[in-house]
Structure formats: structure tokens, C-alpha cells
Design a protein with these regions (language model features):
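A beta-strand edge to alpha-helix "cap/lid" segment located at domain peripheries
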Residues: 20, 28, 63, 70, ...
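Glycine-rich beta-strand-turn "strand-cap" elements at beta-sheet edges
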Residues: 37-43, 73-95
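Short, well-ordered beta-strand segments in beta-rich or mixed alpha/beta enzyme
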Residues: 1-6, 36-63
Length: 95
């Protein structure tokens, strides 16, 4: 899954902190294989979250955790994220 978040003007630092808090919690979830956060070099305040889970069930469990609920509640005040800024992906098998 990839999520894109653009910080509201003047709130990039606060959004960055919320993302860091979320990452610290999510990385400890048993079904989380990868949770990496990035900030665009050319667009300060634009963040990308890259997440990989062991299974669809692990991702569903992740969505029910308190840190995720807290993050989702905080995002509207800090970000201009729109529907479609979250993309679920399936890996292409090579070989």
C-alpha cells in the first residue's frame, strides 16, 4: 500500500511527527513486513507511506489498531489528503 499526504501550509512538521509516531507503532505489529515513510525532495511537506503486510488479514488487523485510528483522526487537520491518495498494490512475481 502507498499513501500520499500533502501537509497543510505550516503543518509539515506536525504531520511528520504524527507519521513518525505511527511508524514506530506499526513496525511492531506482527503482520507488518515493511512500513517506510518518505518526504518528497522536490515538494516539502509531501509525504509517502509505503506499507507491506504479511496477508490481507494482517492488513485488516492493522486498520483496527488504536494508532491507526488516532492517525486517521489527526490527518484531516494536518493534511489535504483526498480519496484516492491511498493505493493498494499487488506484487508482480518475477521469475
Amino acid at each position: 500500500m502507498i499513501a500520499a499526504l500533502d501537509a497543510r501550509p505550516g503543518l509539515a512538521g506536525q504531520l511528520r511527527e504524527k507519521i513518525a509516531e505511527l511508524a514506530a507503532q506499526v513496525r511492531r505489529e506482527p503482520g507488518c513486513l515493511t512500513f517506510t515513510a518518505y518526504e518528497a525532495r522536490d515538494v516539502p511537506g509531501r509525504f509517502y507511506l509505503y506499507e507491506v503486510y504479511a496477508s490481507a488479514a494482517a492488513f485488516a488487523e492493522h486498520l483496527q489498531t488504536q494508532p491507526v485510528h488516532d492517525f486517521i483522526a489527526a490527518v484531516p487537520a494536518l493534511s489535504t489528503a483526498q480519496p484516492g491518495s491511498l493505493v493498494q498494490l499487488d506484487e508482480i512475481t518475477v521469475g
